[in-house]
Regions:
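Active-site-adjacent "lid/gating" segments in soluble enzymes
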Residues: 1-97, 101
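Short C-terminal domain-edge/linker segments immediately following a structured domain
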Residues: 2-8, 77-82, 119-121, 127-132, ...
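Compositionally biased, intrinsically disordered/low-complexity regions enriched for serine, proline
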Residues: 7-10, 158, 169
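Residues that form or immediately flank small-molecule/cofactor binding pockets and catalytic motifs
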Residues: 53-55, 164-167
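Aromatic-enriched alpha-helical interface/lid elements that frame and gate functional surfaces
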Residues: 85-159, 166
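Active-site-adjacent capping/gating segments
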Residues: 167-173
Length: 173
C-alpha cells in the first residue's frame, strides 16, 4: 500500500504490474531453460509467482527495509511523495504536472524556470520539504497543464504533464 496520498487510501495502480512482469520473467526463464537444455541436454523447472515478482518491483523499499528496518509507506520516502522535487502538482485547469527533479541540475533549472531560485538550496534540508511543496503547489496553479508544457520546453527541468491514455498515445517521442 505504498501508492496514493499519505493521508488517503491506497491508489489502484491501473496496470497489472506483477502479472505483466511475471510474464516477462517466464519468457526469459523459458529462453534460458531452452538454451541450457540445448547445451547440456538437461531440463529445467521454472517457478514464478506473482508475490515474488511484485516484491522485485520495489527494490528501493526492500533495500530500506532489509538494510535498516525502515518501512516505506505512502508519503514517507522519496518514491511515494515525501520529496517536493519528485512529486505531482495540480495545475490551473485541474490537470497535473509530474516533477522528477532528483538530479541537482534539473532542480536548479526548475527553480530558475519558476523564478524561485530561493528554493534551490532549501531542497538539501528535509525540514523544508513541506514549505517547498506549498510553494510549488502555488506556482503550478498559475498556469494550465498545456501552458506549463509549452513554457518548460527547452528548459531541461525533468517536468512533464500527466497525460490521459489517448494523449500519451498521441504524444511525440
Amino acid at each position: 500500500a505504498m501508492s496514493g496520498e499519505a493521508e488517503g487510501k491506497p491508489a489502484i495502480p491501473g496496470v497489472l504490474m506483477a502479472d505483466m512482469n511475471a510474464s516477462m520473467a517466464a519468457g526469459m526463464s523459458i529462453m534460458i531453460a531452452l538454451r541450457h537444455a540445448q547445451m547440456t541436454g538437461e531440463g529445467q523447472e521454472i517457478d514464478i509467482n506473482l508475490y515474488n515478482v511484485a516484491m522485485t518491483l520495489m527494490p528501493g523499499a526492500a533495500s530500506l527495509y532489509f538494510g535498516s528496518g525502515f518501512v516505506a509507506q505512502r508519503g514517507n520516502n522519496w518514491l511515494t511523495g515525501q520529496n517536493p522535487n519528485y512529486n505531482i502538482y495540480e495545475t490551473k485547469d485541474g490537470r497535473y504536472m509530474s516533477v522528477g527533479c532528483l538530479e541537482k541540475k534539473f532542480w536548479s533549472n526548475l527553480c530558475a524556470a519558476l523564478e524561485r531560485t530561493d528554493l534551490t538550496e532549501l531542497i538539501e534540508d528535509s525540514s523544508q520539504y513541506d514549505y517547498i511543496k506549498e510553494q510549488l503547489t502555488i506556482a503550478f496553479k498559475k498556469r494550465t497543464m498545456r501552458e506549463w508544457e509549452e513554457y518548460l520546453v527547452g528548459k531541461d527541468t525533468c517536468v512533464t504533464p500527466v497525460l490521459n491514455f489517448d494523449e500519451a498515445c498521441a504524444a511525440p517521442q
